[in-house]
Amino acid sequence: MWRDLERICQADGLALALPPVRFPQNGLKAARLALIGEPGGWTPAFTRAVFAANYAEQKDIGDNATLRTILAALGVDDDAAFAAANTPENKDALKRQTEEAAARGLFGAPSFTIGDELFWGNDRLEAALKWAATPKA
């Protein structure tokens, strides 16, 4: 698994430090923050920074200080982000997304769904895009 991840990171220009100091990590706080970042448009940059903190910098992505540092570097008000992430509404929204993923049969990342079709794995992205572009009868 790690060698495969190393090849993918090399191909995509992503830093990776192996072996990981912590694996697996608790990504719940990061997931809650990513969800509230969607309306503001900072979720992609946040996600990439969390990936780097986890896999390149060997930081604890469940630690509030790590996440606050990432948010601050993105120009996001970390106090406001944490407050919004921890509301019952946001927690429920993440639970709903997780339940939907389970109901659709998602079991790993990355997974893609086009309608009811499930594509799993980074190497299946092109197939998912092709499927999405193909007219269905």
Model-identified regions with their sequence ranges:
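Structural alpha/beta surface segment adjacent to cysteine/selenocysteine redox centers
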Residues: 1-54
